[in-house]
């Protein structure tokens, strides 16, 4: 399990804008996935959720998942903090800063939720404040 000290340390390592992204996104846990939507409290697709959460920190991301992490914003996983973007082909997620935990809108029929990353080598990490 996760200890409170691990979660607090992850939270403390993130700046206020990253913290705002994470808090904003967490308000949508349980909201249904729906392709090409960004409707708080109603439905999101993966890139709609990341775009909406980052807009609340004053950063505008591209609408499509494949364009949300740019070459300028890409970071090594060791530098990733809570609120950073995670991308795999066709899917964008928000890193929780703890172990391999992410928040995302998973797929049709799914709900916005917290999940564990599997096959970490398939994922790229990005800090939108750098791009």
Task: Name each region found by the language model.
Residues 92-93:
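A conserved glycine-rich beta-strand in the N-terminal activation segment of trypsin-fold
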Residues 1-32, 99, 120-131:
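Intrinsically disordered, low-complexity
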Residues 66-75, 96-131:
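Aromatic- and glycine-rich peptidoglycan recognition patches
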Residues 31-82:
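Catalytic cysteine-centered active-site loop
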């Amino acid at each position: 399990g996760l200890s409170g000290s691990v979660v607090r340390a992850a939270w403390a390592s993130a700046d206020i804008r990253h913290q705002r992204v994470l808090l904003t996104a967490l308000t949508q846990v349980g909201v249904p996935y729906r392709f090409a939507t960004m409707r708080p409290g109603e439905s999101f697709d993966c890139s709609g959720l990341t775009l909406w959460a980052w807009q609340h920190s004053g950063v505008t991301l591209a609408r499509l998942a494949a364009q949300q992490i740019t070459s300028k914003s890409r970071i090594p996983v060791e530098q990733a903090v809570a609120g950073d973007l995670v991308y795999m082909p066709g899917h964008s997620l928000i890193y929780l800063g703890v172990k391999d935990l992410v928040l995302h809108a998973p797929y049709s029929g799914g709900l916005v939720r917290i999940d564990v990353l599997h096959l970490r080598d398939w994922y790229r990490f990005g800090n939108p404040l750098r791009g």
